[in-house]
UniProtKB/Swiss-Prot annotation:
The gene is rpoE. GO terms for cellular component: DNA-directed RNA polymerase complex. Residues 117-188 are annotated as: Disordered. RNAP is composed of a core of 2 alpha, a beta and a beta' subunits. The core is associated with a delta subunit and one of several sigma factors. The keyword rRNA-binding does not apply. Keywords: DNA-directed RNA polymerase, Nucleotidyltransferase, Transcription, Transferase. Participates in both the initiation and recycling phases of transcription. In the presence of the delta subunit, RNAP displays an increased specificity of transcription, a decreased affinity for nucleic acids, and an increased efficiency of RNA synthesis because of enhanced recycling. GO terms for molecular function: DNA-directed RNA polymerase activity. Belongs to the RpoE family. One of its GO terms (biological process) is DNA-templated transcription. This is Probable DNA-directed RNA polymerase subunit delta. It comes from the Bacteria. Residues 14-83 form the HTH HARE-type domain.
Amino acid sequence: MKLDIFAGQEKSELSMIEVARAILEERGRDNEVYFSDLVNDIQTFLGKSDADIRQALPFFYTDLNTDGSFIPLGDNKWGLRSWYAIDEIDEEIITLEDEEDGAPKRKKKRVNAFMDGDEDAIDYSDDDPEDEDFTEETSDVEYDEEDPDDEKSEVESYDSELNEIIPEDDIEEVEINEEDDEDDEEEE
């Protein structure tokens, strides 16, 4: 293989990524290359041994992915990003994904491993009708509406309970002097 772009340069000084770019440019847009074929072409051009290529392969693949001038086209095919307009790149990728989808996948039926066809077995995943008996419905609960007469009877019952504890005769009358309270606030 001969690449005119590298005429007069020492092959040992060339990187695999530079050679890959030159190979793809020479082949042209309609000739995307499988990764393995690209690596074989690079090995042939540079004249490197299999051991040298195997050692450099992880770094080359990383460079191929991180270098912005290459684009994966699916099925491990590679091309140059400059071959495609930005909108066209999305379309290429989408059409490749659509082709891979093929027939729609059938959903698997869920099977309970503990239900081995025994009709008498209890299926605990179903809602039990007994559970509904324990719930209270809010429509059955009646709330007391406020009635002023009820409040009076509550106050009277409270007072009568207090009188049982402390009879009224034992309660001392305390005078509240509001003027004293105002003076205390002014002093502070």
